[in-house]
Amino acid sequence: MTVRVSRTFEFDAPPADVWAFISDAEQRAGAISVVDSFEVHDDRTATWHVALPIPMIRSTIDVETEEVARDPPNRVKFVGKSRAFRVTGEHEITETDDGGCRLANEFVVDGKLPGVEAFFKRNFDAELDNLEDALRASLASPA
């Protein structure tokens, strides 16, 4: 079973400000509650250490992430691979007529171990709330 979730956020901020957050692998990882820690290796790759509260997994999982598409300041797509799951995330920014922007987010998780997909199915909405909250906080803080 594959879990797919999409959600769009609206911001009263210029696309470049939203791009500054969403194109930053460190900020994306930091917004996700199950990411215990992470290392950014270069502009395209990072390792997320993910703790999933499911019986089959008793330690953190190393998820090797790589940006596979980047079209500044409009779109970034990444793929994360681990022994427990594969995740694809895509973020696309479009400017709105009022000078703000819309951020479309899509995530797909393919689980390799029992319980992984069920966990993400139950928790994806909360994780997207976390991402939106972190982005809004970033936009509200002074540069």
Where are these regions (language model features)?
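Intrinsic-disorder/low-complexity, polar/charged segments enriched in Ser/Thr/Lys/Arg/Asp/Glu/Gln
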Residues: 2-8, 33, 45, 62, ...
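Glycine-rich portal/gate segments that line the openings of hydrophobic small-molecule binding cavities
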Residues: 39-82, 134, 138-142
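A short, structured loop/turn motif at beta-sheet edges
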Residues: 15, 40-43, 68-73, 92-102
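Hydrophobic pocket/interface hotspot
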Residues: 18-22, 28, 46-48, 67, ...
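Beta-strand/loop substructures that line and gate deep hydrophobic ligand-binding cavities in soluble
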Residues: 79-133
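Hydrophobic ligand-binding cavity/cleft-lining segments
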Residues: 1-45
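Short amphipathic alpha-helical signal-transduction/dimerization elements
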Residues: 26, 124, 128-143
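Hydrophobic/aromatic beta-strand elements that line small-molecule binding cavities or substrate pockets
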Residues: 7, 35-36, 62-69, 80, ...
